[in-house]
Amino acid sequence: MAIVGVGIDLVSIPDFAEQVDRPGTVFAETFTPGERRDAADKSSSAARHLAARWAAKEAVIKAWSGSRFAKRPALPEGIHRDIEVVTDMWGRPKVRLTGDIAEHLREATIHVSLTHEGDTAAAVAVIEEP
């Protein structure tokens, strides 16, 4: 396996929290029902957990875009919803892809790490391909 893309993203949690449920924002249709359910089940702010997932989605897009250096961008409409951040029973995150991005990255392995500290959420994504 070779690393073909790396992405990172930072999110201001207070700014994100103001917009996440506002009708007409990009965030309204971004998160899957599973992501919203997982965030609502957390003991702290749902917005805090969704902000980290937004950062992960953005990091995956940046890693994918970087893997396509010197190639035409291929960002399908609604791409954020096609990138779902799921966690196992111990809270370890993994990315599940659907739609066009799943087809583009069908042979790839995506590693993702999420964090939040204070008012900031962050994520890093690494894409490996054979």
UniProtKB/Swiss-Prot annotation:
Q: Which residues cross the membrane?
A: none
Q: Where does it mainly reside? A: cytoplasm
Which taxonomic lineage does the organism of this UniProt entry have?
Bacteria, Bacillati, Actinomycetota, Actinomycetes, Mycobacteriales
- What protein name does the entry list? Holo-[acyl-carrier-protein] synthase
Which of this chain's residues are annotated to bind Mg(2+)? D9, E58
Name any Gene Ontology BP term.
Answer: fatty acid biosynthetic process
**GO molecular function, one example?**
holo-[acyl-carrier-protein] synthase activity
Query: Any idea which UniProt keywords this protein has?
Result: Cytoplasm, Fatty acid biosynthesis, Fatty acid metabolism, Lipid biosynthesis, Lipid metabolism, Magnesium, Metal-binding, Transferase
What subcellular compartments does it reside in? Cytoplasm
